[in-house]
Regions:
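Terminal low-complexity tails and localization/encapsulation signals of metabolic enzymes
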Residues: 1-35, 68, 72, 122-143
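Signature tryptophan residues that serve as conserved aromatic anchors
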Residues: 13, 55, 146-148
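N-terminal alpha-helical segment of soluble enzymes
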Residues: 25-92, 118
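Short alpha-helical
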Residues: 42, 79, 83, 94, ...
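Long amphipathic alpha-helix in the N-terminal Rossmann-like dinucleotide-binding domain
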Residues: 71-81, 94-121
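Short linear capping/connector segments at secondary-structure termini
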Residues: 87-95, 102, 125-129
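Rossmann-like NAD(P) dinucleotide-binding subdomain of oxidoreductase/dehydrogenase enzymes
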Residues: 123-214
Length: 214
């Protein structure tokens, strides 16, 4: 059984603040094959604080910088494609062919489409005599489900990066391994510290902390 007992906060893998853990079960074999740490409110607070700090700089990046960043994420995603598919197969109990051809492909498809749109997206628009400027809104909190995990992550993380937002992700605690691999992708791709953060945990604790008013 492999342990994944750290969270990704402010550009680094850090230990969980508490001692709670959860076994990850492959539904096809009904056997536990990995173990994750379950986060606490303190972990979420650290991740949000890191995202807020990073927003001050990342929100001012140019379209060119964000295009280059997304290109890097996609390049590393393709390099880790088989690892992502294997993680999805194990955590969902899905056939490897389905994990490769559909599940992992969905995440890549979202990132690629976001990149395509970003290249020509008009952040400033003239309406009559008014200039409307679309600006990054701030820190995004993402809570994603177990089904189609990389599809759900890709369609949230990609647009946030393109818009210049920073983020904290809480993947499903019953299908978290593909999110961990994706986080490794983000790190290797050179996403600036604090722009993307990931905290594993359950809904009543991590989910509630992430969804509560600031």
């Amino acid at each position: 059984m492999k342990d994944h007992l750290q969270f990704y906060i402010d550009g680094a893998w850090v230990p969980a603040s508490g001692g709670r853990t959860l076994e990850v079960v492959n539904p096809a074999t009904e056997e536990a094959y990995a173990r994750i740490a379950l986060g606490e409110t303190a972990d979420v607070d650290k991740a949000i604080a890191a995202a807020k700090r990073a927003f001050e700089r990342f929100s001012r990046t140019s379209r060119k910088e964000r295009v280059e960043l997304l290109e890097s994420v996609i390049e590393v995603y393709k390099k880790r494609y088989d690892d992502i598919a294997e993680a999805i197969s194990d955590e969902m109990g899905a056939p490897m062919s389905f994990a490769r051809q559909a599940q992992a492909a969905a995440g890549l498809g979202h990132l690629s489409e976001v990149l395509r749109v970003l290249r020509d997206y008009e952040f400033d628009e003239i309406i009559n005599e008014t200039v409307v400027t679309r600006e990054p809104v701030g820190v995004c909190g993402f809570i994603t489900p177990w089904n189609w995990p990389l599809n759900q992550i890709g369609c949230k993380v990609g647009p946030a990066l393109a818009a210049g937002c920073t983020m904290v992700l809480k993947p499903s605690e019953i299908a978290p391994i593909s999110a961990i691999v994706f986080t490794e992708v983000m790190h290797e791709a050179g996403v600036p510290a604090g722009v993307y953060n990931m905290v594993n945990g359950d809904g009543p604790t991590v989910g509630q902390a992430l969804a509560s008013p600031p």
